[in-house]
Design a protein with these regions (language model features):
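SF2 helicase/translocase NTPase motor core
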Residues: 3-55, 59-164
Length: 165
């Protein structure tokens, strides 16, 4: 009896295990201004296609996410959207400018109007047509921590069809 239960449990656990299916691509030449560890993280994220970069304060998350977004936009010829808190949007645009990555702000109530890297804040995401996106970056993804949060569920639902995220 105990062996049957253990066997059933092992089967159950094996069914729950998920294997990573690569959805990414080999990145091109990444910017020289990335440190070696940042380059490796961006390469890893590009190869996965769907990845999360959880790096400590001061390790260059913004530069890494913008480098990834720029690679996706270049690879697909499409639109990549960065969703960020309003307070960090301008800082992200400035950092992109500093490192040669153009980041355009989505007009209020609008949607990205062409290929490239775009940014808007979480409060404006309802105006975005996510079916037009080729990539999505969630800056300050702590917004996803509230497992019962409405914003979290809206993002999950909207991002289902975005190939790179």
């Amino acid at each position: 009896m105990a062996a049957d239960i253990l066997g059933d449990y092992e089967t159950f656990v094996k069914c729950k295990a998920s294997a990573h299916i690569s959805a990414g691509f080999e990145p091109g030449d990444l910017p020289n201004h990335l440190f070696d560890f940042q380059t490796e993280i961006v390469k890893w994220a590009c190869l996965r296609g769907r990845a999360a970069i959880f790096a400590d304060t001061g390790l260059g998350k913004t530069l890494m996410q913008l480098s990834w977004a720029d690679e996706v936009a270049s690879k697909t010829g499409g639109t990549v959207l960065v969703l960020a808190p309003l307070a960090v949007s301008e800082q992200t645009i400035e950092q992109g400018r500093t490192f040669g990555i153009e980041v355009s702000r989505v007009a209020q109530g609008g949607t990205p109007t062409g290929p490239g890297v775009w940014i808007t804040n979480y409060e404006r995401m309802d105006a975005i047509d996510f079916t037009e996106l080729h990539g999505l970056v969630l800056d300050e993804s702590s917004i996803l921590k509230a497992h019962d949060g409405k914003t979290r569920q809206r993002i999950i639902d909207a991002a289902q069809g975005v190939p790179y995220r």
